[in-house]
């Protein structure tokens, strides 16, 4: 789970920035 946090965080940031 902890290892997936960076990936999820970068994914969410990408979605937010794309808007």
Curated annotation (Swiss-Prot):
Modified residues (Lysine amide): 19
TM regions (residue ranges): none
Subcellular location: Secreted
Any one GO BP annotation for this protein: defense response
Gene Ontology CC entries for this record: extracellular region
Keywords carried by this UniProt record: Amidation, Amphibian defense peptide, Secreted
Tissue distribution of the protein: Expressed by the parotoid glands.
Domain of life: Eukaryota
Main location: secreted
Family to which this protein belongs: Belongs to the frog skin active peptide (FSAP) family. Phylloseptin subfamily.
Name of the protein in question: Phylloseptin Bu-2
Organism from which the protein derives: Phyllomedusa burmeisteri (Brazilian common walking leaf frog)
